[in-house]
Amino acid sequence: MAIETFLALEASGWKGKRGTALVQVKGDAAFIRRATRALAEGGRCQIVTLRAGATPVASGIVLRHLSRAFFFKLGVDEQFAKFSPGVQLTLELTRHLCADPEITSVDSTASPDHPMINPIWRGRFAIGDVLVPLRRNDPLVAMIHAALIARQFARKTARRAVRVARNLKSR
């Protein structure tokens, strides 16, 4: 089954080492199995797999809604890292989606300035958060807004710190 191949590949790589693979988070594996099956029945989910012979080396989950596709998740066999299986799958997926007359746009769902996706998919959608107060002049809105800004700053700072620590560790 394609979802099992994806889950195994994702868990075998860096996501598995960091404990963030779907099969490692309680309930996530069961949820993704049910969700992909239900969405696939309606033509709204594809699991694509790149193989070297019979060996799966990369797999991704693509979600579809109306005329848009979303490259939701990617898992790779890091034993094949020197061949860039994630990039190879993304390139093949790009050709596939560009040839699909029903798809007008694709979202990588990657973070801004993602090192793998940016050189391949250069276009960007402007996406933002909107906070809508339910009561006029609600003071809670300003506090929530400040908390969201603080969270974003903390995440960026933490990511930078992790990057620096990894660079120091690899020296």
Predicted feature residues:
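A conserved beta-strand-loop-helix scaffold within acyl/acetyltransferase catalytic domains
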Residues: 1-82, 170
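A sequence-level detector of short, solvent-exposed, charge-rich linear segments
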Residues: 22-29, 33, 51-54, 58, ...
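Short glycine/serine- and small hydrophobic-enriched flexible loop segments
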Residues: 34-37, 92-99
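A structural signal for short secondary-structure junctions
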Residues: 41-42, 55, 63-66, 88, ...
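Conserved acetyl-CoA-binding loop-helix of GNAT-fold acetyltransferases
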Residues: 82-95
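Active-site/acyl-donor-binding loops of N-acyltransferases
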Residues: 98-169
